[in-house]
Amino acid sequence: MKKLYWIILIAVVLACSGILMSLHLSVTKEEMTYPSFLDAVNQNQVASVQFKENDSTLKVILNSDKDTTYIVPNPKTENFTEFLLLRNIKVDNSDSYSATKVIQIILIITVGTGVFLFIRTSGGKDKPLMKDAAKNKKAENRVKLGDVAGNAEAKSMVGDIIDFIKEPEKYSALGARMPKGVMLYGPPGTGKTLIAKAIATEAGVPFYAMSGSDFVQMYVGVGASRIRTLFNKAKKSEKAVIFIDEIDAIGKKRARSTSASNDERDQTLNALLTEMSGFHENKGIVVIGATNRLDTLDEALLRPGRFDRQIEVGLPDILARKKILKLYGDKKPLGDDVDLEVLAKNTVSFSGAMLENLLNEAAIQAANEKSSYIQSSHVDKAFYTVIAGSPLQDRSFISEKDKSITAYHEAGHALATKLLQPEQYISKVTIIPSVKGAGGFNLSIPKDSLYQSKRQILCSIQILLAGRVAEELIFGEEEITTGASNDIQKASAMLVDYLNKYGMDDEMGLFSTVVLEDQYDTDFLNKCRNQMHALYDTTKKLMTENKKLLIEITNELLEKESLKGEDIDRICLKEAV
């Protein structure tokens, strides 16, 4: 409110100054010679004269035209004021500021105040920073490791950190020192922040949490100052957990550029490194960083003595997903038809945050339908809302031809999945467009696996190409559409990795072009193109042999708009019989 008050006040002052300036500038000024001035005096035409002793000009106003100011050279003679007064002319030679100078002073004060307030509000909020940290210390220390479902390995690796904070003597007796820093890395939404909070809670120490972006400002030196202030606050607690989320905002590899933004980031990073190096006297303080991109961090940040321990917090497997769903599901009224085990199976590649969002969306669906329980239908709607966005309500603009193209395209993906990777579970095939712009989508659930085989990669590329193949097979080569653009992009990325990263190609052998810093030559690009054409032709042959199945799936898809994996199985089984 105080900031808004100052903004309004400055705006009003500027507006008033502008009005005064415009009024002042609206006064007409004309030059007059001194002889003409004397003639006007002798004819009693002069109303007033304004001047100061050292002024080079006089400002004269006539009785006949008081809206015009005449500028007359100042003769600077003795008794000039008496000469005018004896002729009943008003004389103003007071040492007062002109309107122009008054306006200039007002503008200078206003602009100066505005600059001061801007610097104060955006440059150095160390006190509010510490106020937030103190608030986190009281309010956030509620999460325990038991509240973090899944990530058993990560929780196990932070266990000794907690024990070290609580009983440092047990370790120091054996000459062990506590890791100065712990780096939690992994995809977004996997529970890195929760684990950091749990460490502080389990150890019973204050928790100071800030985001890396809070330290980076446009003014060089502000970020470094905030780092020092935060660490000084933590040191007063003797034992504490300092958590810096999105640490890559300040910890990226230092560039050679000398721009101001790089100077600020480098100074902030140097301040962080210095503070961590001086922790030998503060054995109860541990710094925890979190990032989605470990590979972008500066080597100096990850060396021993800084962030000694690096812990991956990955996506949950099926058992962890089941635990996470149960954790959040216990807080909601789930119906008897909601099977969390099946849901865990269908949510491959979901993070913990996505699983929480899934059940939250299901609860919203149930509330919208005024249901007392979250039913399986609500979970299904929420699942596809999270994956592809809400269904488009108004579909009147979609022509029958576009609908048919979408149906054949999605049926092509589904059929190729069934033929090439039958181990994958087809969850849903739909031609209902979403608000995210998708005309339809095909959702297949792969099995949890650490690796992909050569066959799986090539089959995945063929499945991506199958949508375009189906379009060409049914509508002709000249009628293929832009609907496969995203499929082609994904297939190209997979093929490049297949050829230059995984060493699976017979001709290229065990050589990766990644070491060449992505400087691909023409031969490599031609090889990618030829390999893609070969996979396309193989897919086209497969779809031609099963064209009848493609048409059957498409017809039912056009009729029902959405099909499940069981429907695809039934159609394939019927055709086989």
Curated annotation (Swiss-Prot):
- Mention any one GO cellular component term assigned to this protein in its UniProt record: plasma membrane
On whether Membrane is a keyword of this UniProt record, the answer is yes
Which residues, if any, are the signal sequence? Answer: none
How is it placed in the membrane, per its record? Multi-pass membrane protein
Give the source's domain of life in one word: Bacteria
SMART domains the UniProt entry points to = AAA (SM00382)
Q: Name one GO biological process term.
A: protein catabolic process
Needed cofactors = Zn(2+)
Keywords, A to Z, come to:
ATP-binding, Cell membrane, Hydrolase, Membrane, Metal-binding, Metalloprotease, Nucleotide-binding, Protease, Transmembrane, Transmembrane helix, Zinc
EC numbers on record = 3.4.24.-
Residues on the membrane's Extracellular side span 25-98
Task: Give the top-level enzyme category.
Answer: hydrolase
Annotated Gene3D superfamilies: 1.10.8.60, P-loop containing nucleotide triphosphate hydrolases (3.40.50.300), Peptidase M41 (1.20.58.760)
As to how many cofactors bind and how, the note says:
Binds 1 zinc ion per subunit.
Residues at which ATP binds: G186, P187, P188, G189, T190, G191, K192, T193
Q: Which residues lie on this side of the membrane: Cytoplasmic?
A: 1-3, 120-577
InterPro entries reported in the protein's UniProt record: AAA+_ATPase, AAA_lid_3, ATPase_AAA_core, ATPase_AAA_CS, FtsH, P-loop_NTPase, Pept_M41_FtsH_extracell, Peptidase_M41
Q: Which annotated residues bind Zn(2+)?
A: H409, H413, D487
Subunit annotation: Homohexamer.
Protein family per UniProt: In the central section; belongs to the AAA ATPase family. In the C-terminal section; belongs to the peptidase M41 family.
Protein role: Acts as a processive, ATP-dependent zinc metallopeptidase for both cytoplasmic and membrane proteins. Plays a role in the quality control of integral membrane proteins.
Please give the name of this protein.
ATP-dependent zinc metalloprotease FtsH
